[in-house]
Regions:
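Residue-level detector of secondary-structure boundary/capping sites
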Residues: 3, 74, 116, 174-175
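A cross-kingdom marker for long, charged
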Residues: 179-208
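A C-terminal-region feature
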Residues: 22-32, 158-164, 173, 196, ...
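N-terminal helix-rich structural modules
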Residues: 22-150, 157
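Bacterial Sec-dependent N-terminal signal peptides
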Residues: 1-25
Length: 208
């Protein structure tokens, strides 16, 4: 069965800070970093927000959709260079330093990057969560994406796949699926049955 991973871009604005702090001598750079990351956030989201309309008008396999994906991929590559430079220099900056949107930009760019990059920065994000600097819900999405890329089952059920033959969406395989909602609740995610309604998926939790 041919399938493709749906790039999740539902941003609710509820992401909290992922911050490691920056050197005191760099405090004056906060405004500059905030502006940079605000710009990156906009670039990451604005083309993805066009996907629904382009698909509805032209179809998923249309030239228009392929052109849009080419644009997204080019923007992602540029954003990734900028974000990894920031992360390598300052660590994972929190909303107290770069604002909530700037903080979300860090997550989005890594979430939309390649497997090697995701695996590199996953430990940094884990540490941020342990130190109360990041929301577990953000980490859950990255954990799931990396797990699937490694050929494993996802943990939180955040990743949705699409059957390209039927056009229908479905939940990618989940480890210990019967207890997935407990894990989702532990990181502040809604029950899976509610989450998948965004893709019109009729989902029932398996019996324990």
């Amino acid at each position: 069965m041919k399938e493709t991973t749906l790039i999740l871009c539902l941003i609710t604005g509820t992401f909290l800070a992922i911050g490691q702090g920056i050197p005191k001598q760099k405090i004056e750079s906060n405004k500059n970093l905030t502006n940079q990351l605000d710009s990156i956030y906009i670039e990451d989201q604005k083309y993805r927000e066009m996907m629904g309309d382009v698909e509805a008008k032209h179809g998923m396999e249309s030239k228009e959709m392929k052109d849009l994906w080419n644009t997204i991929n080019k923007k992602d590559a540029i954003n990734l260079v900028r974000v990894t430079k920031i992360l390598d220099t300052y660590g994972w900056l929190g909303a107290d330093v770069v604002g909530e949107r700037g903080n979300s930009a860090l997550f989005l760019v890594i979430q939309h990057s390649n497997q090697t990059t995701q695996e590199k920065y996953l430990p940094m994000m884990r540490d941020a969560v342990k130190n109360g600097k990041a929301q577990g819900s953000q980490l859950a999405l990255l954990e799931d994406r990396v797990a699937l890329a490694q050929g494993k089952k996802q943990i939180y059920g955040s990743q949705i796949h699409r059957d390209m033959q039927t056009g229908k969406y479905f939940v990618a395989p989940i480890e210990d699926e019967a207890n997935v909602n407990k894990r989702r609740a532990s990181v502040g995610l809604e029950p899976l049955e509610e989450y998948v309604q965004h893709w019109n998926i009729d989902y029932k939790l398996p019996a324990k």
